């Protein structure tokens, strides 16, 4: 794997956020279409209408996960920009990598997102975390901070979904 710079990684993160925005927009449009179909078919085809409602719920969950992923990428972007100034890589990025892995697992095997997120995670691990593990100073609980980051991303995602996408969770 080619060693990449933080600037290149930041560019990848920004592109991933843009793609996530596109997918959220597509999912929103699909959600609106399914809601219209559900309402128009409720009298004639109640079973079909129920299936549309179920798919609407699945699409909403997908949007929630995408917004959380976008927020985690924004946090990663901020941390990488801060890292340029600060310098201690392992302590700063390990919890975010763990949180991205967990959220990627929730998202499933997406053809569109998995390769992008895998590449970002792999770059962070091989280029920034692995070479610096020997000089890791303070011991931190990576899993706990990852859970905290996921909780923070979930809270921000709920707020953003309510304000921008009119989705209540």
Curated annotation (Swiss-Prot):
The Gene Ontology biological process terms listed for this entry are:
cell division
Q: Which UniProt keywords apply?
A: Cell cycle, Cell division
What InterPro entries does the entry give?
Answer: Cdv_Coordination_Protein
Outcome of gene disruption: Deletion mutant forms extremely small colonies on selective plates. Forms enlarged cells, with a highly elevated content of DNA. Mutant shows aberrant cellular localization of CdvA.
NCBIfam families, alphabetically? Answer: cell_div_CdvB3
Per the entry, what this protein does is: Part of a cell division machinery. May fulfill a coordination function between the Cdv proteins during cell division.
For this entry, the protein name equals Cell division protein B3
* Native source species: Sulfolobus acidocaldarius (strain ATCC 33909 / DSM 639 / JCM 8929 / NBRC 15157 / NCIMB 11770)
Record gene name: cdvB3
